[in-house]
Amino acid sequence: MTTPQHPEDFLHAIRTRSAAEDGIFWVDDTRLGVFEPEAARRVSATNWRRFVLPDRLIDMLRRRRSPEVRWSQIRSAWLTQLHTLATAEHHGSLIDRMERIIDERLGEDVDLVMLTQDVALRSMLPVALSGLTSGESELVRRDLEMKLLRLVSPEPAGTWHHLRFVVVQLRSGLVVRRVLRQRAHGKRGRELDLADPFVDLLPQLGMDRALDVVTTVLTAIGGPPGTAAASLLYEFVRHPDWQRRLTEELGAVDPVEFRTTPTHAAPVTHRFVKEVLRLWSPPLLLVRRNDFPFDFGKTRLEPGDWYLLSPHLIHRDERVWKRPDVFDPDRFLPGAPHGPADRTCYVPFGWAPKKCVGANIGTVQLMGLCHLLCTRYRLTVEHPEKLTMALRFAPVPEGFRGRLALR
């Protein structure tokens, strides 16, 4: 595994230790690796149970407690809004936005990693925060792009870059504050996005906590979706047999049915997306602080200890997956002998009840990208068999360039 600060292949070393020590071991003196599927599920679920937002800044300054708001309430508001957005019309709008962004770069020799980040971010931004002016949208996008570059860059950023990052982050935060305040005062229309439910909760949350909530969802669309999309293109160009299978299915599917329920309308494509996420789900490692005592037999995790989780390592675990390093979407066929041992073994979006709220719309976005690749565009990449994947905060295909043209 390569990271900006860790050039050694330490992820491989952790995987080797996990296989030898049954998935639970001290990675170093301060962090316990919890890579056994059931243990990871239990630790994640228990620590989420009473997870609350921090107190408002004004209340901390006055040394008093804020009204308690649990993250489960925030998740519930997001899920309700996402359910409203789960229609053929909204799915179609998401796919149409991706199409317009890709059309801007037709015929160019492009960095496909950066293109997919741009496509994923710009197409998903209206889902998170819509109704922005062009200037506001540019500020928010620049903030998210700079956060991403800090993660994927192979070299640490310098002082000047850090100062620019802070300034852009502050200006983006001011945009979010202005949008929420103007919606609350009736000076800006309400929107069907993931920020809007918190306009009504402003008296309880306070502006600083509302900003944190909206920033959380903006950050979530500013890296992982584009990383997953780049990984999808990586496997797409490396497997011409699956290109043919997807093209055959998506060329025959009813467009309205696909936009309504893509996972039902295109099961082969859905399996392809699931296998991409199994092999390359971002981020690779999650660091968490523990709040409850756990006894794992050979060791304990005490309150205040730090622990690591990794969907990537669970998805590559030979104890629960057969031939885990082989790309084979048909492992997700019902009854496939090389499929997941049980539901706890496939966690590309994390563990319930903290599973990523954007799992469904993220899947729609990736399947929509497959549909565009197979019905509208032709992607050309030289020597796809020579492509390699760098493992940084997330998987990043190296030297991944190509051209998109209309079919």
How does the language model describe each region?
Residues W48, L309-P337, A359:
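Conserved cytochrome P450 K-helix/beta-meander segment immediately N-terminal to the heme-binding cysteine loop
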Residues A88-T227:
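Cytochrome P450 heme-thiolate monooxygenase catalytic core
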Residues P37-E38, N47-W48, R56-M98, V113, ...:
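Cytochrome P450
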Residues M1-M60, C345:
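N-terminal membrane-proximal hinge/A-helix region immediately C-terminal to the signal-anchor transmembrane segment
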Residues G222-E249, V357-Y377:
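Cytochrome P450 catalytic-core helices
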Residues T2-T16, P255-G297:
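Conserved cytochrome P450 K-helix E-x-x-R motif and the immediately C-terminal K′/meander segment
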Residues T261, V320, L333-E398:
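Cytochrome P450 heme-thiolate "Cys pocket" and heme-binding signature region
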